[in-house]
Curated annotation (Swiss-Prot):
It is found in: Nucleus. One of its GO terms (biological process) is transcription by RNA polymerase III. Zn(2+) binds at C1095, C1098, C1107, C1110. This is DNA-directed RNA polymerase III subunit RPC2. It comes from Saccharomyces cerevisiae (strain ATCC 204508 / S288c) (Baker's yeast). A zinc finger (C4-type) spans 1095-1110. The gene is RET1. It catalyses: RNA(n) + a ribonucleoside 5'-triphosphate = RNA(n+1) + diphosphate. Component of the RNA polymerase III (Pol III) complex consisting of 17 subunits. Its EC number is 2.7.7.6. Gene3D superfamilies: 2.40.50.150, 3.90.1070.20, 3.90.1100.10, DNA-directed RNA polymerase, subunit 2, domain 6, RNA polymerase alpha subunit dimerisation domain, RNA polymerase Rpb2, domain 2. InterPro entries: DNA-dir_RNA_pol_su2 (IPR015712), DNA-dir_RNAP_su2_dom (IPR007120), DNA-dir_RNAP_su2_hyb_sf (IPR037033), RNA_pol_bsu_CS (IPR007121), RNA_pol_bsu_protrusion (IPR007644), RNA_pol_Rpb2_2 (IPR007642), RNA_pol_Rpb2_2_sf (IPR037034), RNA_pol_Rpb2_3 (IPR007645). It comes from the Eukaryota. Present with 1950 molecules/cell in log phase SD medium. The keyword Metal-binding applies.
């Protein structure tokens, strides 16, 4: 940044010097035209921080939640506002208003337990939901304000949170980190994120073709507040049918259209095909269906459909009513029918049919399911809104039942106060919301929606892993199927989704991440837009006759035809002009589609969009003056929108635009300019320096490893008590930064250290990416980290008034504590700072033996017997007690948390990685005296084998080394931003100026012989991350140990001190070697040898020398077999299969 300002100053001075008037009269001045912009090319990235202040990254979650709390809740209440009683017609209860977290009377918010306290005390961070109600009591109508009906979990940093708009000092008071992204919930003390869910868009027609079966189908998923259903228009043997789940069989399309009131075949033909003869030829065959079935009137058609409806209702309707009901409410449910006027629905079905006919005529006219414009992203707000509405309906139902129960009794009916029973059910809403968020299972009765894995625990491995989790998109696609379509990188994802950040393995391409400048829209009202369209010259669809429908472009609002327009281009331009002047919401998109002759307007939520600079007449509208005002704080990002300099485009509208990547590329026909090209990457991929010089999978690997790097987590990391925390002791910010690093504040909470690296071979312990580390560097703290583990204990209270207690420590005859209790304090808890070794106790808890007995009312002072239930430390290395916290949980039980700390220095086998997807383990640690050094006496911290470069092609790593070296010598932090950054020539020039080699190679001397090495060595700083995979956590061996109860074989897994299994493949290998005794020893003697008595005669097993089958003891032979084999034989016997052992003597006499 400093360097940039210096450069800018010199630039301005030059202009002052050369301000001679005659120079300016020449057409070209200093290589620039007069009309050229000054310096904007470098400066327009200042729009990025301005954008991230208002939108982007985590703001999507917050906006969505705020919209739900402020707008959606009120809509839900309005839809379900009345509760009436079946018993007493006089009674009613009406919800007037709803608020979260603040009462109507006082302007202040309620006191909420601060989020940090909720984390420590295992509570839920939530605010009360208040309603104002009006109801009858006897003859009176009563208004009641601020009735609490439950508690709503609050998203951190949303507008109902304490941290909303808090400055740094207030954050510090609340023990919160100002850089923490927010956007998650705290439920029972754990941080839960609702991931962005990806789905196909609702209420839109999607045409697909199945080439194998030769089927073309158009489907639309209708989603309303009451129901979700899918309607298909499909082809079968060249004829077209309508299909719906609630109708038993497919119905010919002509009959459906007749049922909707379009009776003449000519009109059906006009609606579907217009004047296009080729479409008419394809469609004509469908008109015969109705005459075959003798259906000519609307009533006949409705009866035909009614007969086919699957009935689920209790009261019987006539066939005609069934048909009307099906067409009015079931088929294409998102269109409402008023006064039995089916015209709109007929047009919609005709449009679907037309799309099918077009696809039959031209197979290219089908839609792509994986195209980003056909997808919608669901955010936390929408998901909780569905959940809350479900719970609220259930709450009202239970409420009504309990009111009816009371009103039925004749004596109580006079003065019944409904308020008394509202509190009984209020727990339903609270626990329903909490359960859904903590388990991640969304099950809604109305939609038959069952979804698992919606929420995840926020990963706090590093600051980046938490941030990356907020931008993750999970798609509801089965991971097991190996389909390449949805996993592929779509061109429409450009700028919307990060190209590099996706996991490898089965979820590859299904789990995506948002790019840096994306925003996800929320719903906007449709009605005003509809009116606006009619004002701008759209003819209302209900007034157009069928014949002229297809002569002009159709206008669609959220997929529904609302009219037609004669001059589409003019209409689109006018509409965009209104949007740019701020008369219409900036997130509404409009685009024309010439293939379908349609103009589409979209106002629905869940579309991905991103901001672009508007270009008019070959000039970027953002001028230098605007950027200066932005830097001075006179303008913010919203002003740029209002002034019509910047606008949001979604994927569909991007297809209508011509976008320049750089200002120098602008030609007159272009419509937009990218704000910055590097924003096609997301937050995690933005950390990589010079990613455009790397092979693409390397960037993908780094995205996965950057989330596992140990570093600083948050400013409040020492106040937190998490299950497992990894912290680096001396994190450094990288020498080579990127713009993204500054934007997401990674330089304030970094995860890694700048290591001096020599690229050379040393010792042979560096084969296959292993690293050679310098022992002295480790002594000085390179790569040192600490782990913190939490143990939680609850002191329970039992029904019979007994409770768990913490005992004191035991002492020996000298008055010293016994070895097991050495780390305890006098109160029976570990003392802070004490060392705990494996086998020592650090919480000395005792439990009453009679806790299960019934409460004893008579003799209260019975002496309670306790047995010890201490918490014992188990671990290969000793730990230190870091914090002890005592508190009270929600249900008034004492809660004790102890945090254990371990300091770790790097050892052989610990995993490191650079920022270019090059991971390696530490292969050997060498003393500084034996390491090579250069003529200034600098010794590398890491020696890396040069064979890591050729096949990986990570040129970015080499450039990072040169930039970092130049930065160190020059005293600046260099930039390795994608598609930009510090130029290699400039860096090399700095190296030469400072007396180093142009290519970053140095002369090194051997540390062993002191002679000069025979080659120049590539030598300089590279940013290295220490990953969470450490040997100490994985090391495992076993000689003897526990065995499983059932099979009597050694247990499995490191945590249970399990054995190492010699599996099937290893067994085959041993057989191939012919080492049969080894096989016997491993698979039986050392595993689960067992002596059985086998009867030679019948081949079944007996016991203690007696064959139970033959009832004799003659032919019993003792032999050793694996216990698992004996178990198998007995299990087979229980299933009526008799495995008989045929024995023969090996050593025949």
């Amino acid at each position: 940044m400093v360097a940039a300002t210096k450069r800018r100053k010199t630039h301005i001075h030059k202009h002052v010097k050369d301000e001679a008037f005659d120079d300016l009269l020449k057409p070209v001045y200093k290589g620039k035209k007069l009309t050229d912009e000054i310096n904007t090319a470098q400066d327009k990235w200042h729009l990025l921080p301005a954008f991230l202040k208002v939108k982007g990254l985590v703001k999507q979650h917050l906006d969505s939640f705020n919209y739900f709390v402020d707008t959606d809740l009120k809509k839900i209440i309005k839809a379900n506002q009345l509760i009436l009683s079946d018993v007493d017609p006089e009674f009613y209860l009406k919800y007037v208003d709803i608020r979260v977290g603040k009462k109507s009377s006082s302007s202040t918010k309620d006191y909420l337990t601060p989020p940090h306290e909720c984390r420590l005390r295992d509570m839920t961070y939530s605010a009360p939901i208040y309603v104002d109600i009006e109801y009858t009591r006897g003859r009176n109508i009563i208004m009641h304000k601020d009735v609490e009906i439950g508690r709503m979990p609050i998203m951190l940093r949303s507008n109902k949170c304490i941290l909303y708009d808090a400055d740094e000092s207030k954050m510090a008071k609340l023990n919160e980190c100002p850089l923490d992204p927010g956007g998650y919930f705290i439920v029972n003390g754990t941080e839960k994120v609702i991931l962005v869910q990806e789905q196909l868009s609702k209420n839109r027609i999607i045409v697909e073709a199945d080439e194998k079966k030769g089927i073309v189908q158009a489907s639309v998923t209708s989603s309303t507040h009451e129901r979700k259903s899918k309607t298909y228009v499909i082809t079968k043997n060249g004829k077209i049918y309508l299909k719906h789940n609630s109708i038993a069989e497919e119905i010919p399309i002509a009959i459906v259209l007749k049922a909707c009131g379009i009776l003449s075949d000519l009109e059906i033909m006009q609606l579907v095909c217009g004047n296009d003869s080729s479409y008419q030829d394809i469609f004509a065959v469908n008109l015969e269906e109705s005459s075959k079935l003798d259906i000519y009137t609307q009533q006949q058609a409705l009866e035909y459909i009614g007969a086919k409806v699957k009935t689920m209702r209790r009261q019987k309707l006539t066939i005609l009513q069934e048909g009307i009901e099906a067409i009015a409410t079931t088929v294409i449910a998102h269109l409402t029918v008023e006064a039995l006027d089916f015209r709109e629905k007929a047009l919609y079905i005709a449009m679907m049919t037309r799309r099918v006919v077009m696809a039959m005529y031209n197979p290219k006219m089908i839609d792509d399911r994986d195209y980003v414009g056909n997808k919608r992203l669901e955010l936390a707000g929408q998901l909780i809104s569905l959940l809350f509405e479900d719970l609220f309906k259930k709450f009202n139902n239970d409420f009504k039942l309990s009111i009816d129960k009371v009103l039925k009794k004749p004596n109580r009916a006079m003065e019944y106060d409904a308020l008394l029973s509202i509190n009984v059910h209020s727990n339903n809403i609270t626990s329903g919301l909490n359960r859904a968020i903590s388990t991640g299972n969304w099950s809604l009765k109305r939609f038959k929606m069952e979804r698992a894995g919606v929420t995840h625990v926020l990963s706090r491995l590093s600051y980046i892993s938490a941030l990356g989790m907020m931008t993750r998109i999970s798609s509801q696609f089965e991971k097991s199927r190996k389909v390449s379509g949805p996993r592929a990188l779509q061109p429409s994802q450009f700028g919307m989704l990060c190209t590099a950040d996706t996991p490898e393995g089965e979820a590859c391409g299904l789990v995506k991440n948002l790019a840096l400048m994306t925003h996800i829209t929320t719903d906007d009202e449709e009605e005003p837009i509809k009116k606006l369209c009619y004002v701008l010259g759209v003819e209302d669809i209900t007034l157009i006759d069928s014949a002229s429908l297809h002569l002009n472009y159709g206008v669609y609002l959220n997929g529904t035809l609302i009219g037609s327009i004669r001059f589409p281009t003019k209409f689109v331009t006018q509409f965009r002009h209104l949007r740019r002047t701020g008369k219409v919401s900036e997130f509404i998109s409009i685009y024309s589609n010439s293939h379908q002759m349609a103009v589409h307007i979209a106002t629905d939520g869940g579309r991905i969009c991103r901001p672009l600079i508007i270009v008019s007449d070959g000039q970027s509208r953002v001028k230098d003056i605007h950027l200066r005002k932005l830097l001075d704080g006179e303008l913010d990002f919203d002003d740029f929108l209002k002034l019509g300099l910047v606008e949001y485009l979604d994927v569909n509208e991007e297809n209508d635009s011509y976008i320049a990547l750089y200002e120098k590329d602008i030609v007159p026909s272009m419509t937009h300019l990218e704000i910055e090209p590097f924003t096609i990457l997301g937050a995690v991929a933005g950390l990589i320096p010079y990613p455009h010089h790397n092979q693409s999978p390397r960037n993908t690997y780094q995205c996965a490893m950057g989330k596992q790097a140990i570093g600083a987590i948050a400013y409040n990391q020492f106040k937190r008590i998490d299950t497992l925390l990894y912290l680096m002791t001396y994190p450094q910010q990288p020498m080579v930064k990127t713009k993204t690093i500054e934007l997401i504040d990674y330089d304030k909470l970094p995860a890694g250290q700048n290591a001096t690296v020599a690229v050379m071979s040393y010792s042979g312990y560096d084969i296959e990416d292993a690293l050679v580390l310098n022992k002295s560097s480790i002594d000085r703290g390179f790569g040192r980290c600490e782990t913190r583990r939490k143990t939680t204990t609850v002191l329970k209270r039992y029904a019979n008034h007994t409770q768990d207690i913490i005992g004191g420590m035991r002492v020996d005859e000298n008055g010293d504590p016994i070895w097991q209790h050495q780390s305890l304090g006098p109160d029976g808890l570990g003392e802070v700072g004490m060392k705990v070794q494996s086998g020592q106790i650090y919480i000395n808890k005792s439990v009453p033996t009679n806790s299960a007995d019934a409460p004893n009312p008579n003799n209260v002072n019975v002496q309670t017997q306790y047995r010890e239930a201490p918490v014992i430390y188990r671990g290969p290395e000793p730990s230190h007690i870091d914090q002890v916290m005592m508190s009270v949980s929600d249900n008034d039980q004492a809660l004790i948390k102890v945090l254990l700390r371990q300091n770790r220095r790097p050892e052989l086998g610990d995993k490191f990685s650079s920022r270019h997807g090059q991971k390696g383990v530490c292969g050997i640690i060498v003393k500084q005296e034996d390491m090579p050094f250069n003529d200034q006496g600098i010794v590398p911290d890491i020696i890396m084998n040069p064979h890591g470069f050729p096949s990986r092609m990570t040129v970015g790593k080499m450039i990072e080394l040169i930039s970092g070296k130049a930065g160190v010598l020059n005293g600046t932090l260099e930039y390795g931003t994608c598609f930009g950054g510090s130029k290699l020539e400039d860096m090399s020039k700095i190296l030469v100026d400072q007396g180093f080699n142009y290519s970053g190679k140095d002369m090194l001397y051997s540390g062993i012989t002191g002679e000069c090495l025979q080659a120049y060595i590539f030598f300089g700083p590279i940013y290295y991350q220490k990953l969470k995979h450490m040997v100490l956590d994985k090391m495992h061996a076993r000689a003897r140990g526990p065995r499983a109860v059932l099979t009597r074989q050694p247990t499995e897994g490191r945590s249970r001190d399990g054995g190492l299994r010699l599996g099937e493949m290893e067994r085959d290998c041993v057989i191939a070697y012919g080492a049969s005794q080894l096989l016997l020893e491993r698979l039986m003697i050392s595993s689960d040898a067992f002596e059985v008595d086998v009867c030679d005669k019948c081949g079944l097993m007996g016991y203690s020398g007696w064959c139970t089958t033959c009832k004799s003891a003659e032919n019993i032979i003792k032999m050793t077999i694996p216990y698992a084999a004996k178990l198998l034989f007995q299990e087979l016997l229980s299933m009526n299969i008799a495995p008989r052992l045929r024995l023969e003597d090996i050593f025949q006499q």
